[in-house]
């Protein structure tokens, strides 16, 4: 299954607030479609599937990509669910978004793909790059790149920058000081249900 490129608000209405996907307010609380207002108790599978979909759409991943992250998280020591969230949060595209350099993760992905973002002074155009503590993130020293990010910084997608990151607006740079804590993950979900979903496949 490829990455979703359809209407973002439609997905938010179905799954709830997805800060990484869209900054548009959800006008209707019920799901889209002809039967959106009908209520019924979802099955356990449906609940696990919904939590998985929240993760996939918020971070803009294909099914194959998310499954690879789940497998990687299982190989590391600690809570698999929390490690999964850390792996996703420490992606370069998400880190650019959390610094406020882009209003959404898709916008951050474009910045990275088009070579506007540097790690320790070197252009990195790989969205899945895992940011590490001690690394600096900056905007390419070109007028077009700087103007783009300056405009984004004026209207960030989220109000607060996580405690593991710091931003220097004057020189359009940020620094990774650690790994994100669970409390700073902006997405509302139960990550254990995501792990259960893949364990039962």
Swiss-Prot record:
Entry keywords, A to Z: Chloroplast, Plastid, Ribonucleoprotein, Ribosomal protein, RNA-binding, rRNA-binding
* Superkingdom to which the source organism belongs: Eukaryota
Q: Which GO terms describe its cellular component?
A: chloroplast; small ribosomal subunit
For bias type Basic and acidic residues, the affected ranges are: 35-45
Domain named S4 RNA-binding: residues:
90-153
**GO BP of this protein:** ribosomal small subunit biogenesis; translation
Locations listed in the record: Plastid, Chloroplast
Q: Which InterPro entries match?
A: Ribosomal_uS4, Ribosomal_uS4_bac-type, Ribosomal_uS4_CS, Ribosomal_uS4_N, S4_RNA-bd, S4_RNA-bd_sf
Q: Where is this region: Disordered?
A: 15-45
State where it is primarily located.
plastid
One Pfam family hit: S4
Give one GO molecular function term: structural constituent of ribosome
NCBIfam families noted in UniProt: PRK05327.1, rpsD_bact
**Subunit note:** Part of the 30S ribosomal subunit. Contacts protein S5. The interaction surface between S4 and S5 is involved in control of translational fidelity.
Concerning its family, UniProt says: Belongs to the universal ribosomal protein uS4 family.
- Tell me, in a sentence or two, what this protein's role is: One of the primary rRNA binding proteins, it binds directly to 16S rRNA where it nucleates assembly of the body of the 30S subunit.
Can you say what this protein is called? Small ribosomal subunit protein uS4c
Q: Gene encoding it? A: rps4
């Amino acid at each position: 299954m490829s990455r979703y490129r359809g209407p973002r608000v439609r997905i938010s209405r179905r799954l709830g607030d997805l800060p990484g996907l869209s900054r548009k307010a959800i006008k209707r609380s019920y799901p889209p479609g002809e039967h959106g207002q009908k209520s019924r108790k979802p099955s356990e599978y449906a609940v696990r599937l919904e939590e998985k979909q929240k993760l996939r759409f918020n971070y803009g991943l294909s099914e194959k990509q998310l499954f690879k992250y789940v497998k990687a998280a299982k190989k590391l020591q600690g809570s698999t669910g929390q490690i999964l969230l850390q792996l996703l949060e420490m992606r370069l595209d998400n880190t650019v978004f959390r610094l406020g350099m882009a209003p959404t993760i898709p916008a951050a992905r474009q910045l990275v793909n088009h070579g506007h973002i540097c790690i320790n002074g070197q252009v990195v155009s790989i969205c899945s790059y895992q940011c590490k503590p001690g690394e600096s993130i900056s905007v390419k020293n070109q007028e077009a790149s700087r103007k783009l990010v300056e405009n984004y910084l004026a209207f960030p997608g989220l109000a607060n920058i996580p405690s593991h990151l710091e931003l220097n607006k004057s020189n359009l740079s940020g620094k990774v000081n650690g790994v994100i804590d669970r409390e700073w993950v902006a997405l509302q979900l139960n990550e254990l249900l995501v792990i259960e979903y893949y364990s039962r496949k």
